[in-house]
Amino acid sequence: MKKNSITSSSISKTANLKAEIINISDEATIGENVKISAKEIYISRGCKVEEGTNISATGTIFLGDFTLIGANSIIQVNNLTLMDYSKLQRNMFMNGGNDCFIGYNSWIGSNCILNVAESLYIGNGVGIGTYSSVWTHGHHGELLEGCKIHKVSPVRIENDVWILGCYNVISPGVVVGEKALVMTGSIVTKDVPPMTAVGGNPAKSIPSLAPYEEVTVEDKLVKMTSFIQEFCELFTSSKKLSGEKSSWLIESEYGSHTIVIVDSTEELESLEYSIAIVKKGLREEKEYKGSVFDLSSKYYYKTSSKIEIKFIQFLLYEKARFMPINGHTRKYER
């Protein structure tokens, strides 16, 4: 990326950006009275930083495609990474001077506190309800006078965790496992195993509540077919095509688009499509004609077409979440 590439016409004249390297997509939006300062700033396509927000980093700020940082948020970190389609709603307060990494398709409600005195990792598809707080440090008592409560420790919130409702607290050093559920008003002081529901103060396991049930790829296919039919209804002209393959033709302001469902990517070689749903077989090293969504791996081949973006935004956040197998490659390195 070249130094200081600012081509967006959607940057407010009252916005103030300072960095050694600034690279902003011409499809990003920076609101009024926004202040962003860092060593390096990268703001991607469709990203919105709303009015009155103040972001400062000693290192790098990276905001992926169609991300959001809501109005009047305050962020003070070392490095900030926010991957595609993740959203931080208004009045976010994030401080502490360490690194914060937030993966793809995550949603964090308004008025949350994310403390980064130590590193904070939030995975893909995480949901955190409003007025919740995540703490990587807990100290105030005077050590000179013998206070024994003093902790600074990283926090990890793994993929597809749902911190439900509001007023939840995640304590320093905690790991919340993949697809865990934290009920409203919980104080989490210990690690939460994957696929476990917890609640209360302090939060304890709720064995009677299973956050997820096991599904097969065939189950996913049935659900995705229903989602596609619902998606097609958004357009004034759409129809299901006859033939051996499940396929639909839609007309949008972007043109004509075909959506197909096949068993594997090998079947796509002879087909024309804008969006394809496959049971398996998506490969990182291969190029495809259109956007391909793999139900087994939950990855997709990213083309950044307008119909792909509309489809992803339709699926988010509760229907289905996919991660790009190509495109942005930033990773959490701790």
Where are these regions (language model features)?
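Terminal amphipathic alpha-helical/low-complexity segments used for targeting or macromolecular assembly
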Residues: 1-14, 19, 26-27, 46, ...
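Flexible, glycine/small-residue-enriched loop-and-beta-strand segment within the central core
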Residues: 19-24, 29-174, 202, 208-210
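Residues that flank catalytic or metal-binding motifs in active/ligand-binding sites
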Residues: 130, 184, 194
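A generic "structured core" feature
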Residues: 158-160, 181-187
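Compact, basic/aliphatic-enriched, mixed alpha/beta core segments that act as assembly/interaction modules
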Residues: 173-175, 179, 186, 227-228
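Conserved catalytic segment of ABC-fold P-loop ATPases
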Residues: 177-180, 193-195
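Short helix N-cap motif at coil->helix boundaries in the Bergerat
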Residues: 190
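Conserved active-site beta-strand element of glycosyltransferases/polysaccharide synthases
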Residues: 198
